[in-house]
A protein has these predicted regions:
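Elongated, amphipathic alpha-helical interaction scaffolds
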Residues: 1-301
Length: 301
């Protein structure tokens, strides 16, 4: 889980990917947020709870600026499995940023909204938990009019309409396409769309699929200047074949050593040292003995 979380962050921290996600999910694909207007925000913060200092860390956060003025803070939170308490987490993240704006040193500065996007990257099941605060807490009906509700902006990437998925222009399209195909077909067929951030994407694919070959081929992919997932999968497949051959050779060595050991044991019991020496130096004679004692039978199937 932690590995997936880290690799998702690596890809989304790139401004072209981050702005693409925001523009497609919030603005119907219109290029409202430009790459150059995004600036990294601090993602970790400390809270004092029950007398102890506890730390919380957003996945990715960026300020959207006009000149030096903050228009908004966007935060991305990735989830590969549904989390019933996600509204609590989002409130905590957002509240920390609003709390920062309320400090004395910021009193005269322009105030800006905090917008968190929860990206659900699972494809085995839909997100069935409530997406608002009142959906997860028990509230007496007499109190309900006074309890502020808080909803989360949750996007189930694998379940987006195909038209929306195809609106992504960055490497995030490759991830969204993969999730969609796995949900619908339980199989992935690569596309020839160009990859912008090869290392980050391959590490993410390695974490999402559990196939370490994606990560193992990063250097080779960079050397060969791989440009799309079709080429990536060609290398991955070749690496698999190569490993299969290596395993076959190793297995053959082990089986060969086992046969020779069994032959030497038989000859030793016969007490014929000359046979042992000749069997280990004369290949033709050794093969005759192997056939004579039926030692090849188990390995010829």
């Amino acid at each position: 889980m932690q590995e997936k979380d880290i690799t998702q962050k690596m890809l989304e921290r790139h401004n072209d990917v981050f702005s693409d996600i925001v523009n497609v999910l919030l603005f119907d694909g219109k290029k409202v947020v430009e790459e150059e207007t995004l600036f990294d925000a601090v993602t970790d913060s400390a809270l004092k709870i029950d007398g102890r200092v506890r730390f919380q860390d957003r996945d990715v956060a960026k300020y959207w600026k006009d000149s030096q003025i903050n228009i908004a803070l966007f935060g991305l939170e990735n989830q590969t499995t549904p989390n019933k308490l996600m509204p609590f987490r989002v409130i905590s993240y957002d509240g920390t940023e609003y709390g920062k704006q309320s400090r004395t040193e910021n009193i005269d500065k322009k105030k800006y909204p905090v917008i968190s996007l929860v990206l659900y990257l699972g494809f085995e099941q839909k997100w069935l938990y409530p997406k608002n605060l009142l959906g997860i807490i028990d509230v007496d009906e007499k109190l309900k009019p006074y309890v502020n509700d808080y909803k989360i902006n949750l996007f189930e990437i694998a379940y987006l309409d195909r038209e929306i998925i195809d609106s992504f222009k960055s490497d995030f399209w490759i991830l969204a396409d993969y999730l969609h195909q796995m949900r619908v077909n339980r199989n992935y067929v690569a596309d020839n769309k160009s990859i912008g951030h090869i290392e980050e994407l391959l590490m993410l694919m390695s974490a999402m699929t559990g196939d370490k070959r994606f990560e193992e081929i990063i250097d080779e992919a960079n050397t060969k200047e791989v440009v799309n997932m079709c080429e990536v999968l060609d290398i991955v497949e070749a690496r698999g074949i190569e490993k299969g051959i290596e395993k076959g050779i190793e297995k053959g060595r082990e089986e060969g050593a086992d046969i020779i050991s069994r032959l030497n044991t038989i000859l030793a019991k016969e007490g014929d040292l000359d046979k042992i020496i000749k069997a280990n130096t004369d290949k033709k004679y050794r093969n005759e003995l192997l056939k004579k004692y039926n030692l090849l039978r188990d390995y010829e199937k």
